[in-house]
Amino acid sequence: MSALIEAARRALSLMDLTTLNDDDTDEKVAALCRKAKSPDGTVAAVCVFPRFVPIAKKTLREAGCPEVQVATVTNFPHGNDDVSIAVAETRAAIAYGADEVDVVFPYRALMAGNRDIGFELVKACKEACGGKLLKVIIESGELKDAALIREASEISIRAGADFIKTSTGKVPVNATLPAAETMLAVIKEQGGQCGFKAAGGVKSATEAAEYLALAARLLGEDWVSARHFRFGASSLLANLQIEIAGGVAKPSSGY
């Protein structure tokens, strides 16, 4: 097995298979969930809007892969700084049955100099999760500056984030290797317990392999597991499957 095929299989097992589109329906979400398990492997999670969590869990059970986690999003996509709304949305997500919540950090507030509201929001949402996994989307492509990316990462981890995540996938610049390196370096400095999720823009096995290699270099091969590392993507799945089959991945405009 080639190194790239091996990386593709590994990346597939670390995917949060995602649909977060305004035109999502029960049928579209169910179709996505039926792709979670294939002869090429099983993804780590699916990520859908809160109202689709029940249909996602039902479809995954029926597809014979109840172990696939169901993630959802809150304070999404704009990362507003109203803590009470973010907490209410997070509680509602858990009530829907979500296993994991991806909350957007109030990144614009941080850019304006407010370093407190992000900590407060993440801490409150972690408490609202009631033991479920909390991933914090720092929107690295909007923060742009490495110092701000570092600061948002540090605040999120101190406030209790289980993962820090690059992007919503709804802005012009999503996951990049430089942002990932900054975030992973902070995770290492903070003890390596927090996980990392690259979201948006990772579309090929070659690109996925670069993120896997970066994480392994900074935190070790054993760290790179679904407990600590995820890809948030949609079009990536088909391209990984093409790579595993020995074909050539085609360009895609998906998440």
Swiss-Prot record:
Keyword terms, alphabetized: Cytoplasm, Lyase, Schiff base
Enzyme Commission (EC) number: 4.1.2.4
A Pfam family matched in the record: DeoC
MF terms in GO: deoxyribose-phosphate aldolase activity
Catalytic activities: 2-deoxy-D-ribose 5-phosphate = D-glyceraldehyde 3-phosphate + acetaldehyde
Keyword Lyase found: yes
Family from the record: Belongs to the DeoC/FbaB aldolase family. DeoC type 2 subfamily.
Function text: Catalyzes a reversible aldol reaction between acetaldehyde and D-glyceraldehyde 3-phosphate to generate 2-deoxy-D-ribose 5-phosphate.
Protein name, per record: Deoxyribose-phosphate aldolase
Organism: Chromobacterium violaceum (strain ATCC 12472 / DSM 30191 / JCM 1249 / CCUG 213 / NBRC 12614 / NCIMB 9131 / NCTC 9757 / MK)
Phylogenetic classification of the source organism: Bacteria, Pseudomonadati, Pseudomonadota, Betaproteobacteria, Neisseriales
Gene of this entry: deoC
